[in-house]
Amino acid sequence: QGAQAQGHHEDSRKRVEMSKGCCCSGGRSCCFPDPERRRIEIDFLYLDLSACTRCVGADASLDAAIADVSTVLKAAGFDVVVNKVNITSKELAIKHQLMSSPTIRVNGRDIAPDVKESPCESCGDLCGSTVDCRVWTHDGQEQTVPPKELIVNAILREVYSGAPRQAQDAGGYRLPRNLEAFFNGR
């Protein structure tokens, strides 16, 4: 009984010592804050979500990919931030260095850096001109909508690489003629 009382006394003393200088009575979250969580930032840049079938499809694929990986990323200590940016002007296209619509970037890196395009009827109808939109190459096939698997793999590649967020180099960007034609026709 004496040893048990002494153990209880030591536990009480440890709690008191832990609480010195803390904002609470020794709760772990107060005295020992959680380590800083890492962040995965996903940018979805698009021209139109009302008529462009490629932008609408890319948005749906991105949402499905995020739904599939977000629980695992959270458990691994990552916060996922998704920025959906409607590029409505030349100025916004230049600011975000848009090469083609739609674009998905993970921590500043395009998920498909080799940009390929084909004529997009829906965007052509929007601006009254011939406009090309992005096509995605996955498993050797070109698709007008990025497959969920392509997006998930890009997110996981970024998580496992541990590389810092890629900064945009403003000096080398020039608004592509295709986007210029889109905004001039709008």
Say what each PLM segment does.
Residues 81-87:
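A short acidic/basic microdomain associated with nuclease active sites
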